[in-house]
Amino acid sequence: FHTGRVWALKLCSASLKEFEYNYKIDGEIVQDPYAYGLHGREHFGVPYDPEKEVRCRFLNENVSGWENETAPAVEYENMILYKLHVRGYTKLARKMVSHKGTFLGLTEMIPYWKELGINAIELMPAYEFCEVPINKPKEGSEHIKTRRKENVVNYWGYASGFYFSPKSAYCSTREPEQEFRYMIRELHKNGIACIMEFYFPEETDSLMALRALQFWRDFYHVDGFHVLGEGFNREMLLRDGIL
C-alpha cells in the first residue's frame, strides 16, 4: 500500500528470523539504512560492497535477557568512566579475555573494572559502520589518482553507518542482538552503566538520528549517549521524553 509516493509493505509471519532482504533502486542493490542487522559484515577490515553478499536482517524481538534487570543509578557527578574501543580494548587484554574483539569479551572485563571502581563504560562507535568502503568511480569519469591510499581502514568508526544495528564484526556469535543485550544485562547486574558514542555527519537526517537513539535506549537498555557530529538537532534530543 502507499500514501502518495511513500510505499509500505507489511509482512505477516510468525518469525522473520530466517529471512533477509535488500532494496533495489534504479537497478542498484542497496541496504536499508534502518536495518536492525546486516549479514555479510562479520569480518572486520573487509571492504564494504553493498552488491556482494551483504543483506539486511529483521529484528529478532524474541531474544531474552531482561529478567530482573535493573539499570544502575549512576549520578553524573559520581561517575567513574572508562572509555574504550570494543575491538582494540579486548584484543589487547591478553589473558583476561577469551572472546577477543567482541561484546562478549567486554563482559569478561567486568571483575577488573569493579576492582578499579569503574561504574560506567563508554563505547566508541559500536553500530554497523563501514571501516573500508568501496569508492567506485562514476561511469564516464576519468579515474584521478590521488595520494590517498586505497582500502585505508577507519578503525575507530567515526563515520556514518547503519545506526540501528550492532556491529556484527564485534560479535562472537551470529546473534548480535542477543550478545549485545547479554552484555548490557551483565554490566547492569554489576552496577555498571553503558554509554554509546554516535557520530552523525552533517547529511544525517535529524529524525533518523533521534529514532536510532530511542531504539537503542528501548530495545538494548543503553543508559546514555555521547553524540558527535553536525547531523542531529540538539534541542530535539534534549526535549525527547524517551531519552
What is each PLM-predicted segment?
Residues 108-127, 219:
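Catalytic domains of carbohydrate-active enzymes, especially glycoside hydrolases
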Residues 95-102, 133-189, 200-219:
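Aromatic- and acidic-residue-enriched carbohydrate-binding clefts of CAZyme catalytic domains
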Residues 111-114, 181-190, 237-242:
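Surface-exposed amphipathic alpha-helices with a cationic face
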Residues 23, 84, 113, 123, ...:
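Conserved, mostly hydrophobic/aromatic
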